[in-house]
Amino acid sequence: MEMKGLKNIRKQKNYSQLKVAMDLSISRESLSYYENGKRSPDINLLVIFSKYYNVSIDYLITGKEFEKK
């Protein structure tokens, strides 16, 4: 599953893949795989990404914030 918001938020914050990977103690290659849908992060890692970027898990997956109806 491609993580549209994961790549978008990293680019919005002008963070390199290397910076994020080092901050979160994961490999840059793994981050690239997550961003491009070659691998899916487990729920624990999604929570870590969500806290790191201060965005919802919905945003990380879809690239859109959850909208209340």
Residue spans of the language-model regions?
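Short, basic-rich loop-to-helix N-cap that marks the start of a DNA-contacting helix
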Residues: 38-51, 64-67
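Residues within the helices of the helix-turn-helix
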Residues: 7, 18, 29, 43, ...
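Recognition helix of helix-turn-helix/homeodomain-like DNA-binding domains
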Residues: 26-40
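Conserved hydrophobic/aromatic packing and binding residues within compact polymer-binding modules
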Residues: 6, 20-21, 31-34, 60
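DNA major-groove recognition helix of helix-turn-helix/homeodomain DNA-binding modules
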Residues: 25, 44-59
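Short basic helix-loop element that most often maps to the first helix and adjoining turn
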Residues: 4-23
